Amino acid sequence: MGTLPARRHIPPWVKVPEDLKDPEVFQVQTRLLKAIFGPDGSRIPYIEQVSKAMLELKALESSDLTEVVVYGSYLYKLRTKWMLQSMAEWHRQRQERGMLKLAEAMNALELGPWMK
């Protein structure tokens, strides 16, 4: 990650160049990020402002994962990474519970195998 993030502007709370060095990087399932960031990433500016960090998302080819790159001061980027990973896990568990409830409901209705 030796290059600067491709953005039109860098938020005022991010100090250039020191906060752009050594970003926190992690991967999250793309469907979970859509739940976190809203349609078309509409919540990203708000999350950046509240967390005092800058986010960059990179879709990984041949995978359902997206790489999340977090820039900012040391504590802010660690806190933002933890927050986003926690939110992704919460959404994953919520979707999993929904699928289990759906399976239970289908079993309760005794739907034939052609309906499953």
UniProtKB/Swiss-Prot annotation:
Pfam families: MOEP19. It is found in: Cytoplasm. GO terms for biological process: regulation of gene expression. It comes from the Eukaryota. GO terms for molecular function: mRNA binding. Involved in the maintenance of embryonic stem (ES) cell pluripotency. Dispensable for self-renewal of pluripotent ES cells and establishment of germ cells. Associates with specific target mRNAs. PANTHER family: DEVELOPMENT PLURPOTENCY-ASSOCIATED PROTEIN 1/5 FAMILY MEMBER, DEVELOPMENTAL PLURIPOTENCY-ASSOCIATED 5 PROTEIN. This is Developmental pluripotency-associated 5 protein. It comes from Homo sapiens (Human).
